[in-house]
């Protein structure tokens, strides 16, 4: 009798075990390995490619631990690069332009601040020049995820007031974005996440400020997204020095630009900002307030 029960249990359990094993294999396949497992640990990643985008802008590609790894960075978060330069520890935040749809690598687009270019900063940018001088095969330490905002999809933003606060989830229909220079990278991250989901009906409005037309980072990528998703992504530029044939705005971000090219204030509108602190403090915040956007619906990366 015991032998019969044992045989019966194997007959009953075998299909169950088969289904369980199949489920586990599928689950494992659908969950790629994550590089940034612990935000307190530094992960050395190897430079595998360097692309010249413009006279002072580069795209750096770093290999993840395996071709099956993803970075593991939530939308809206950033990483820190750290290294020693002239004996001193230098740490800088960056937002990748690649996403977790990309396996095996992470891309950073960086504007290189060369020495003896700007009279106020004769030494140039320490980290950007370090990256510029890296050789293929060299490594640098990544740490993350970091940041106070996460885009959860379908208009939902989880925002914390500080690192110790619990996130508050805001659901919106429109996102107004003001970016200055390299501040475009977190905006592009959010825009791509919205547009890749056909069921996400959030509309993104980007006002992108630069010194000149040649300084506009990632312009081909932005305009391709606008052309493919014209009803869901609105794009406008302003530059300090405009060429003769220029179809966009000229000058610092002002009240008129915000009224004309960002969504109106409302319960279903969120404003995101990223750029030089003087731009945020003196151009963005005062003019957003004049237009009627409340501070609690404005977030600065």
Swiss-Prot record:
One of its GO terms (biological process) is cholesterol biosynthetic process. It is an enzyme of class 1 (oxidoreductase). It catalyses: 2 Fe(III)-[cytochrome b5] + NADH = 2 Fe(II)-[cytochrome b5] + NAD(+) + H(+). Component of a complex composed of cytochrome b5, NADH-cytochrome b5 reductase (CYB5R3) and MTARC2. Interacts with MTLN; the interaction is required to maintain cellular lipid composition and leads to stimulation of mitochondrial respiratory complex I activity. Catalyzes the reduction of two molecules of cytochrome b5 using NADH as the electron donor. Belongs to the flavoprotein pyridine nucleotide cytochrome reductase family. Its EC number is 1.6.2.2. Its cofactor is FAD. This is NADH-cytochrome b5 reductase 3. FAD binds at residues 92-94, 109, 111, 114, 126-128, 185. It comes from the Eukaryota. InterPro entries: CBR-like (IPR001834), Cbr1-like_FAD-bd_dom (IPR008333), FAD-bd_FR_type (IPR017927), Flavoprot_Pyr_Nucl_cyt_Rdtase (IPR001709), FNR_nucleotide-bd (IPR039261), OxRdtase_FAD/NAD-bd (IPR001433), Riboflavin_synthase-like_b-brl (IPR017938). The modification N6-acetyllysine is found at residues 42, 50, 120. Keywords: Acetylation, Cholesterol biosynthesis, Cholesterol metabolism, Cytoplasm, Endoplasmic reticulum, FAD, Flavoprotein, Lipid biosynthesis, Lipid metabolism, Lipoprotein, Membrane, Mitochondrion, Mitochondrion outer membrane, Myristate, NAD, Oxidoreductase, Phosphoprotein, Steroid biosynthesis, Steroid metabolism, Sterol biosynthesis, Sterol metabolism. GO terms for cellular component: endoplasmic reticulum membrane; lipid droplet; mitochondrial membrane; mitochondrial outer membrane; mitochondrion; nitric-oxide synthase complex. A lipid is attached at residue 2 (N-myristoyl glycine). CDD domains: cyt_b5_reduct_like (cd06183). Residues 40-152 form the FAD-binding FR-type domain. The gene is Cyb5r3. The keyword Transmembrane does not apply. The keyword Transcription does not apply.
């Amino acid at each position: 009798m015991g032998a019969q029960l044992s045989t019966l249990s194997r007959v009953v359990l075998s299909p169950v075990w088969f289904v369980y094993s199949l489920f586990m294999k599928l689950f494992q396949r659908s969950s790629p390995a994550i590089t940034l497992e612990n935000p307190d640990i530094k992960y050395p990643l190897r430079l595998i490619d360097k692309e010249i985008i413009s006279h002072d802008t580069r795209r750096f590609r770093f290999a993840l631990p395996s071709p099956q790894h993803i970075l593991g960075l939530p939308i809206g978060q950033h990483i820190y690069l750290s290294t020693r330069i002239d004996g001193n520890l230098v740490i800088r935040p960056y937002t990748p332009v690649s996403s977790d749809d990309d396996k095996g690598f992470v891309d950073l687009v960086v504007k290189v601040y060369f020495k003896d270019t700007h009279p106020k900063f004769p030494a140039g940018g320490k980290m950007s020049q370090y990256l510029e001088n890296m050789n293929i095969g060299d490594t640098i330490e990544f740490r993350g995820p970091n940041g106070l905002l996460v885009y959860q999809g379908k208009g939902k933003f989880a925002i914390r007031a500080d690192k110790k606060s619990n996130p508050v989830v805001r659901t919106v229909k429109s996102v107004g974005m003001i970016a200055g220079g390299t501040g475009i990278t977190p905006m592009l991250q959010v825009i791509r996440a919205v547009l890749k989901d056909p069921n996400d009906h959030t509309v993104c409005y980007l006002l992108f400020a630069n010194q000149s037309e040649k300084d506009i980072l990632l312009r081909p990528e932005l305009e391709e997204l606008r052309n493919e998703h014209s009803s869901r992504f609105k794009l406008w530029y302003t530059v300090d020095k405009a060429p003769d044939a220029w179809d966009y705005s000229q000058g610092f971000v002002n009240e008129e630009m915000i009224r004309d090219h960002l969504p109106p204030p409302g319960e279903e509108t969120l404003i995101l900002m990223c750029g030089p602190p003087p731009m945020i403090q003196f151009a963005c915040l005062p003019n957003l307030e004049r237009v009627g956007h409340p501070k609690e619906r404005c977030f600065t990366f």
